[in-house]
Amino acid sequence: MSTSDPRASLAAYAATPSAQTFDAAEYARFYEQPPNVKAFALDLWYARGQNFVVGYADAQSGACFSRLAQPDEYVVLLPDATTTVSIKCNGNSRTVEGESIAFVPAGDSELRVSGVGRLILMFTTRSEDLCALCSNNASYRLPHGNIPPFAPWPEPVGGPAIRAYSLDVPDEEGRFGRIWRCSTFMVNVLPAQQGPRDVTKLSPHHHDSFEQGSFALDGAFTHHIRWPWTANLNAWRKDDHEYCGSPSLAVIPPPAIHTSRAMASGLNQLIDIFSPPRKDFSEKQGWVLNAEDYPMPA
């Protein structure tokens, strides 16, 4: 990893993985498949990891998305300025403008779209009905290894409520991306890249015990993934060098070494997804932009 990468200061990046068996990465190229759900003014694609489900929506004015008895908090990411979403949840309502991220509490909720644009929705796999819609659900018929059971983080200060934050946050020296968290997710909207990434400045690293979802919103990325070698040759896996256009989701398993390289000549935008939130990122002062609203576990 480049020493200029803020993540180089994290202790976990120097650790040696102790896992002995390994699962494959997952790749969902939404642009190559029909939507999993078609509704009025709304096309939805779903794919999943061990703990999370990601939904990608192409939406037009009048589109409606609802959840009844949603078991836990979920995420609504609005990357486009042309989209506005009215969110109703448990008798409360809030209008969220485009270029925002919102967190919606458990219970009954409804999203109504004005304008045209994209939505990225994130749920835990406690939403079993959404798991069943995922294009790669069969890959998780048996739980993947090296990942502890999901445990939510504490409720927000002041209790459950619809919360929203602008994505318009300038880059800052020493801070990694633009990170928000809730009780169920951590989302990092990485700096947009223009053109292919410099091959001399990649950032290979690994995670010991959690998956990473890397959602390509714009452009294209090649995900380079290498699994550790152990004494057991039967556990070895070939490297992945997977080209994914957008929209797409790569799910990177622990403890594989990985890095993603922007490939397109224009805009390349990647969003990293973790469920539950990452403790190491949360411990870095100033990295989580809404840390005052969502406490860490005691």
Regions found by a protein language model. Give the residues of each.
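C-terminal functional regions that serve as terminal interaction/effector modules
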Residues: S2-A28, P79-D80, E211-A298
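Short consensus segments that form the blades of beta-propeller domains
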Residues: S203-H205
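A short, N-terminal "cap"/entry segment at the start of jelly-roll beta-barrel domains
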Residues: S2-Y56, E128-K201, P297-A298
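A cross-kingdom feature marking solvent-exposed beta-strand/loop segments within repeated
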Residues: N51-Q70, T82-L121, Q193-T200, H224-T259, ...
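Generic N-terminal amphipathic/basic segments
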Residues: M1-R48, S61-S66, P71-V75, D80-I101, ...
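Double-stranded beta-helix
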Residues: V116-A161, R261-A298
